[in-house]
A protein has these predicted regions:
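Nucleotide-activated sugar donor-binding and catalytic core shared by glycosyltransferases
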Residues: 1-228, 236-342
Length: 342
């Protein structure tokens, strides 16, 4: 068998779907590179659906979320550490087996550790430079983990951050990474049979967003508007809901976002970036205690408490004008990656 030049392993964190969706956007701009994805859960399902090469081998710990509040952060952190050790073994096997010449990681630190040990060029895509899950006595474990994370980051050939800002040392900030569509908004609305004002409720790749689905449906029905409610539940929620059209688990959320008139979503970065890029008004409610989502939603002017004023927000946002923002983060990321290929 002839070995493909530039064979590259792309380790994409399977915690939620935001990592893999931005990674797909990047790989769409890397046609000459033979890319093998390594991930798990819903992320692997999306890649299989889109017919990418994928090793479905990662099994991430799940967040315990009750009524929108993240519980047992310390336990989650401990489980994450065990998961990380397990991923190190898995990634080592894959990297050696594939004779990888380049490792790209979207917040999968295990594969970077191995790549750095084996002196293989390695690129990190991340929007988190430190975690802030725990307080008090357990936070010393997290501080220790952050320290080793910072070490890994420092040793990467390049770190790509999908936000606007300055480049420092090996860190390149390139702006949001968003999937492109080849259709106009009108074509998409026709394709999805959206005939009325359309409100999309989207909760990502975990079951953590159940609280938001229920609260949102209740608020919309209370307002008694002539709208269609579209639900995208991801791979983890199987509960049935009335008065909505449930699209379940999709691989083209960006197109549904573009076709919608309002998006109500958890505060994952990739969804927020896609909503902003396509100019659809959005309401972003974070999981309480999830530092990353709380930061993301704060940047957009929301907080967890907004869950109690959804009716008012929905009316305001349905009146808001669309404001499309051009982003080229995916192309810029691809350009950076190409420099590491022969």
């Amino acid at each position: 068998m002839i070995k493909t030049m530039n064979n590259c392993d792309f380790f994409s964190s399977p915690i939620g779907l935001g990592h893999v969706t931005r990674d797909i956007a990047i790989v769409n701009n890397l046609k000459d590179l033979s890319v093998n994805f390594v991930t798990g859960s819903g992320a692997a399902q999306i890649l299989k659906k889109l017919e990418y090469n994928v090793d479905d081998v990662y099994n991430p710990p799940s967040f315990v979320v009750e009524n929108g509040v993240l519980n047992n952060q310390a336990k989650w952190l401990w489980n994450y550490y065990q998961y990380y050790k397990n991923c190190k073994n898995i990634s080592k096997k894959i990297i050696k087996q594939n004779n990888s010449e380049l490792i790209i990681s979207d917040e999968d630190f295990a594969s970077l550790t191995i790549a750095q040990e084996l002196k293989i060029p390695n690129i990190l895509i991340t929007d988190v430079l430190e975690t802030k899950f725990t307080k008090g006595i357990t936070s010393f474990i997290e501080k220790k983990m952050n320290k080793s994370m910072m070490n890994i980051i420092k040793n990467c050939d390049v770190v790509i951050i999908p936000e606007d800002g300055e480049n420092i040392d090996n860190i390149k900030r390139i702006g949001p990474i968003v999937r492109k569509t080849n259709y106009s908004r009108e074509e998409l609305r026709k394709k999805f049979s959206f005939n009325k004002k359309t409100i999309l409720i989207s909760v990502g790749g975990t079951s953590a967003g159940l609280f938001l689905i229920q609260k949102s449906i209740t608020a919309i029905l209370k307002l008694n508007l002539d709208v269609e409610i579209i639900l995208v539940t991801g791979p983890s929620i199987t509960k049935e809901f009335e008065n909505v059209r449930n699209l379940g688990f999709v691989d083209n959320l960006h197109e549904i976002i573009y076709a919608s008139d309002l998006v109500i979503s958890l505060a994952g970065k990739s969804t927020i970036d896609e909503v902003n890029a396509y100019g659809t008004p959005g309401i972003f409610i974070p999981i309480k205690g999830h530092f990353e989502q709380e930061d993301n939603s704060k940047n957009e002017g929301f907080s967890f408490e907004d869950i109690n004023r959804l009716e008012k927000l929905i009316l305001e946002k349905l009146d808001e004008k669309r404001n499309k923002i051009n982003t080229n983060g995916a192309e810029l990321a691809a350009e950076i990656i190409k420099k590491f290929t022969k």
